[in-house]
C-alpha cells in the first residue's frame, strides 16, 4: 500500500483548464476573459504608423501625400527619401522602387495625355472659329459679287444685258439640294450671322415657312426662347431651296407650326 502525504499532494501541479490549453496551442487566440483589454498605447501607435489601414484606396493615400510638403527642385529620389524619413520608413526595396517607377511613368503619361486633350480642344475651337469666319466672308463676297454683276448689267447700254439683270432679280433661281447639306456647317453659318440678320431670318422663317404671325412674341423680352425647339440649321437651310424644304420637312414644319400656335395662344391669354 502506497501512502501519499498531504505535502506531496500540495506540490503536485494542477491540470490546466481546457480553455487555457487551447490558448497555448494557438497563441494568436485571445481568451474571452481578456478580449476587452486594450493594447498598450505605444503598440497601437506603432502599428498605425507603420502599417496602412486595410483596404486603403490609392486615392486616399494620394490625398495625404498631396497635402505633405515637398522640396521642389530636388530629384525624385531625394524627394522620396525625404518623405520616407518623415514617415519613419526605411529605404525602398527593389520591388518598391519598381512600383514607384511605374507610378511616375503612369503619372507622366496621364499628364501628357491631358495636355494633348487640352491642345486638341483648343485647336478644334480655333478651327471652328476660323471656318465660321471663312463661311461668313465667303457668303458676303458671293453676295457682293452677285450684286456687283447685277448692277453692272443694269448699267450696261446693251438692252439684252439689262433684261438679263431684271430677269435674274424677279425670277426665283433653282435652289440647291438641301438634303446634301452638312448640318454642322449650316450651324456655323448661323453663328456667323449678326443679331439683326438672325432676327430677320427667324421672322422670314416663321412667316413664310410656318405661316404664323410672330408679332405677339416680339412684345416680350427674350422671346427667342420660345422658338428654341426649331433647329438653327433649318433657319439657314430653308433659304437655300424653300420649295424643297417645305416638301422634305413637311412633318417637322407642321409640328413646329402647331407648337408655335400653342405658345402664341398662351401669350395672348397672359396679356
From Swiss-Prot:
Membrane-spanning ranges: none
Lineage: superkingdom: Viruses
Record's keyword annotation contains Transmembrane: no
Protein name: Phosphoprotein
Family: Belongs to the nucleorhabdovirus protein P family.
Record keywords, A-Z: Chaperone, Host cytoplasm, Phosphoprotein, Viral RNA replication, Virion
Species of origin: Taro vein chlorosis virus (TAVCV)
GO CC annotation terms, alphabetical: host cell cytoplasm; virion component
Gene: P
Entry comment on modification after translation: Phosphorylated by host kinases.
Chain intervals for the UniProt region annotation (Disordered): 1-26
Keyword Chaperone carried by entry: yes
Its job: Non catalytic polymerase cofactor and regulatory protein that plays a role in viral transcription and replication. Stabilizes the RNA polymerase L to the N-RNA template and binds the soluble protein N, preventing it from encapsidating non-genomic RNA.
Subcellular location: Virion; Host cytoplasm
Subunit structure of this chain's protein: Homotrimer when phosphorylated. This trimer is stabilized by binding to the L protein. Binds soluble protein N, and ribonucleocapsid.
Amino acid at each position: 500500500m502506497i501512502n501519499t502525504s498531504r505535502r506531496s499532494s500540495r506540490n503536485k501541479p494542477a491540470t490546466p483548464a481546457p480553455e487555457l490549453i487551447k490558448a497555448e496551442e494557438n497563441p494568436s487566440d485571445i481568451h474571452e476573459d481578456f478580449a476587452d483589454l486594450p493594447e498598450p498605447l505605444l503598440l497601437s501607435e506603432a502599428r498605425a504608423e507603420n502599417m496602412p489601414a486595410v483596404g486603403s484606396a490609392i486615392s486616399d493615400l494620394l490625398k495625404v501625400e498631396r497635402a505633405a510638403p515637398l522640396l521642389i527642385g530636388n530629384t525624385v529620389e531625394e524627394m522620396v527619401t525625404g518623405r520616407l524619413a518623415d514617415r519613419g520608413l526605411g529605404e525602398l526595396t527593389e520591388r518598391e522602387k519598381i512600383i514607384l517607377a511605374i507610378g511616375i511613368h503612369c503619372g507622366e503619361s496621364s499628364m501628357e495625355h491631358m495636355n494633348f486633350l487640352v491642345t486638341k480642344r483648343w485647336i478644334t475651337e480655333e478651327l471652328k472659329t476660323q471656318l465660321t469666319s471663312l463661311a461668313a466672308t465667303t457668303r458676303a463676297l458671293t453676295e457682293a459679287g452677285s450684286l456687283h454683276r447685277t448692277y453692272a448689267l443694269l448699267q450696261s447700254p446693251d438692252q439684252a444685258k439689262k433684261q438679263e439683270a431684271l430677269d435674274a432679280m424677279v425670277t426665283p433661281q433653282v435652289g440647291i439640294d438641301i438634303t446634301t447639306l452638312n448640318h454642322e456647317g449650316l450651324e456655323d453659318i448661323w453663328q456667323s450671322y449678326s443679331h439683326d440678320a438672325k432676327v430677320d431670318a427667324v421672322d422670314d422663317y416663321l412667316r413664310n415657312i410656318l405661316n404664323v404671325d410672330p408679332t405677339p412674341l416680339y412684345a416680350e423680352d427674350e422671346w427667342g426662347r420660345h422658338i428654341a425647339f426649331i433647329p438653327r440649321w433649318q433657319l439657314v437651310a430653308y433659304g437655300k431651296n424653300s420649295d424643297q424644304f417645305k416638301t422634305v420637312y413637311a412633318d417637322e414644319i407642321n409640328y413646329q407650326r402647331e407648337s408655335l400656335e400653342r405658345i402664341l395662344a398662351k401669350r395672348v391669354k397672359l396679356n
